[in-house]
From Swiss-Prot:
Positions with a binding annotation for a divalent metal cation 5: C33, C35, C36, C49
Domain notes: Class I metallothioneins contain 2 metal-binding domains: four divalent ions are chelated within cluster A of the alpha domain and are coordinated via cysteinyl thiolate bridges to 11 cysteine ligands. Cluster B, the corresponding region within the beta domain, can ligate three divalent ions to 9 cysteines.
Residues noted as binding a divalent metal cation 2 in the record, renumbered to the chain: C6, C12, C14, C25
Keyword vocabulary terms for this entry: Metal-binding, Metal-thiolate cluster
SUPFAM superfamilies, alphabetized: Metallothionein
Residues that, per the record, bind a divalent metal cation 4: C32, C33, C43, C47
Protein name: Metallothionein
Keyword Metal-binding: yes
Organism: Esox lucius
Binding site for a divalent metal cation 7: C49, C54, C58, C59
Region (Beta): 1-28
Region: Alpha, residue numbers: 29-60
Length: 60
């Protein structure tokens, strides 16, 4: 899957699995958005990004 191009457009939608706003990923699957930190690799399906950190709200 191609990564989001938020740096170019300021917004994106990667195949429905990623939503970005103001060059920031607001929700994504780890295969799409770089904002999901490496710790989120344990998530089986998707990852909810809260800033730049992986906390208890990271994995859904």
């Amino acid at each position: 899957m191609d990564p989001c191009e938020c740096s170019k457009t300021g917004s994106c939608n990667c195949g429905g699995s990623c939503k970005c706003s103001n060059c920031a990923c607001t929700s994504c699957k780890k295969s799409c958005c770089s904002c999901c930190p490496s710790g989120c690799s344990k998530c089986a399906s998707g990852c909810i990004c809260k800033g730049k950190t992986c906390d208890t709200s990271c994995c859904q």
